[in-house]
Structures are given as C-alpha cells and as structure tokens.
Amino acid sequence: MAELTTIARPYAKAAFDIAVEHNAVDNWAEMLTFAALVSENETMKPLLTGSLASTKLAALFISVCGEQINEQGQNLIKVMAENGRLKVLPAVSELFAQYRNEWAKEVEADVVSAAELSSEQQQQISISLEKRLARKVKLNCSTDAALIAGVIIKAGDLVIDGSVRGKLSRLSEKLQS
C-alpha cells in the first residue's frame, strides 16, 4: 500500500493544485472518486494491467467515464495512462481527499460505540473534537458490542479509548506488571 501511495502522491498533488487554482476542489473530488470507482470495476481492472496501448486505454477509460470527467480530468487520465498508472486512481482519490480535508481544515473522526449514539451525543462529541482539534469534524459512527460500554474515537493521529474493554485491558496490564 505504501508503494501505491508513493506512486499516487504526485498525481494527487498536481490534481489538488489545479483544483485549488480553478476553485473546483469539490468538483475534482467527485471526478476522482468516480474515476477510482471505474478503475476498481471488475471489467476494467484487467484492462488497466493488460497490454492495451496507453492511448487506447485512456480513450476507453474516458469514454466509460463520459460526462463525469471534465477536460482537465481527462488530461490527468491520459497522463496516468501514458505512465501505466491508472491502477493507482483509488490511491490518488484517497490522497486528494486528505489534501482537501487539510486545506478545508476538516478531519474525519471514526467513532465506535458499544450502542448506537443519539444525534445529541454525536453533536456533543463533534463539538468537543472541534474545540480540541481546531478543525471542522465529520463523524463516521459505528457500533461494536465487544466494547461493553463507552466509545473509541480516532481522528487523524488522535485516539481516545473510553471503552470499558479498553479500561479493563489497561487494568490487566497494570496488574501483570
């Protein structure tokens, strides 16, 4: 995965720079997400790693994407096809999303709770994280009954384990040492 990220980084950075320059960051995010989905399609995958000429591959890919990709996006597809890099489009899309979140001062936070959180609880977590991180927070909530009670919050490098399972694990470690 690290290798794909290394390969994808210059393409994502170039796309992001163009998107910012043309005030089209959201449009580019949608285009790259769509192109990534096309590249992951079971019919398309073998073509991306096959021996199809780069110009034909780019033309085919662009025709499949249709109106979803503008002229600048098509140019990116052509360059990536020429370099045999269309298979890294999902990583390009992911990196672009990270650049976008950083630029917009946003962070995604994964919140795992033992029981489903009410909208009020989600709002309280969001407000607390926004104060702590000085960024706009988008919550991705899920449940895991194995936590017993409480929540685990992951936002970037920050991990807050407020679950009973986590507390029991830490207590067990202290008792064993």
Curated annotation (Swiss-Prot):
The keyword Membrane applies. This is ATP synthase subunit delta. Gene3D superfamilies: N-terminal domain of the delta subunit of the F1F0-ATP synthase. It comes from Shewanella oneidensis (strain ATCC 700550 / JCM 31522 / CIP 106686 / LMG 19005 / NCIMB 14063 / MR-1). Keywords: ATP synthesis, Cell inner membrane, Cell membrane, CF(1), Hydrogen ion transport, Ion transport, Membrane, Transport. PANTHER family: ATP SYNTHASE DELTA CHAIN. The keyword Cytoplasm does not apply. GO terms for biological process: proton motive force-driven ATP synthesis. It is found in: Cell inner membrane. Belongs to the ATPase delta chain family. HAMAP family: ATP_synth_delta_bact. F(1)F(0) ATP synthase produces ATP from ADP in the presence of a proton or sodium gradient. F-type ATPases consist of two structural domains, F(1) containing the extramembraneous catalytic core and F(0) containing the membrane proton channel, linked together by a central stalk and a peripheral stalk. During catalysis, ATP synthesis in the catalytic domain of F(1) is coupled via a rotary mechanism of the central stalk subunits to proton translocation. This protein is part of the stalk that links CF(0) to CF(1). It either transmits conformational changes from CF(0) to CF(1) or is implicated in proton conduction. It is a peripheral membrane protein. F-type ATPases have 2 components, F(1) - the catalytic core - and F(0) - the membrane proton channel. F(1) has five subunits: alpha(3), beta(3), gamma(1), delta(1), epsilon(1). F(0) has three main subunits: a(1), b(2) and c(10-14). The alpha and beta chains form an alternating ring which encloses part of the gamma chain. F(1) is attached to F(0) by a central stalk formed by the gamma and epsilon chains, while a peripheral stalk is formed by the delta and b chains. One of its GO terms (molecular function) is proton-transporting ATP synthase activity, rotational mechanism. GO terms for cellular component: plasma membrane; proton-transporting ATP synthase complex. The gene is atpH. NCBIfam families: ATP_synt_delta, PRK05758.2-2, PRK05758.2-5.
